[in-house]
């Protein structure tokens, strides 16, 4: 959740004593950020609430968690939904100025679900790898898979909460003229190197580690499906490729900007005012792009699954929105359990 401010481009004074740093005027960037984030956050909140809400409803109403993936999909939808709701609250800051406690909560909850989403995506890819590539090991774990899934989800939430501690502690409500800000402001005793390291951790755990795990696991799954000469490997492989490419396309630009910010802090170099404006602008735009994943996750990880589409139809049928689902209708999923390797991915 990128924010901009009217501030000296250096966090601390430099040069001779008594000489004030040059101020970098960023009102134009602030105006763009306010308009851009208001429109984008509103759109993402509406779309993401519908998609993730349907995933949660179908899981609660029809699905018993039988694997780590089932449990993590449920928690991924919950995490994405909570993250999007914090974006909608961020839009209200201009109308309802936040207090200190609400600002800390807003920053902390956003970061908690930011990391939580990536951790659940990572766990899903590892579980799919185990289910397809390590089938005997996965089968031995099957009787306790649900309990194991909740344990994995609990550990993921705990790790995400630890990573969000700086936001819960240092979130501050500020006001500049008519602009209300909710920002993370580290005390001056915290060195620039420590703040740079904090940004570096965000890049490593928010992009590098999930990407490497996803790419490795899905590459192994793809090799196994091709070697097994599955009846319909192409569609499954296209879905696996889409999972990785969408993740990279949405997360890489913002991760590069955060990495640039970390390098600036760690190397203690000074940006010109023009460069600082461009950096803030890029952080705002790429941040909105990164948050788009919360709307696409339900499509990529649930809506493409045949079982989920059947459960979604049952949900709408129970609400009287559509007719009942005939088990043998053309194009309808068979209620019989599938046994192919690709069925472990639920994307047939």
Q: Predicted regions: what is each one?
A:
Residues 37-40, 44, 149-156, 243:
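Hydrophobic alpha-helical transmembrane segments of polytopic
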Residues 17-27, 96-111, 134, 144-152, ...:
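Loop architecture of class A 7-transmembrane GPCRs
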Residues 152-153, 182-193, 199-207, 219-256, ...:
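Intracellular effector-coupling site of seven-transmembrane GPCRs
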Residues 30-38, 42, 68-126, 130-142:
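Extracellular TM2-ECL1-early TM3 structural module of rhodopsin-like
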Residues 58-65, 93, 124-140, 169-177, ...:
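Juxtamembrane transmembrane-helix termini
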Residues 41-45, 58, 82-95, 107, ...:
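Helix-to-loop junction signature of class
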Residues 49-60, 77, 84-88, 112-136, ...:
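Cytoplasm-facing ends of alpha-helical transmembrane segments in multi-pass membrane proteins
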Residues 1-28, 140, 269-273, 306-348:
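Intrinsically disordered regulatory tails of 7TM GPCRs
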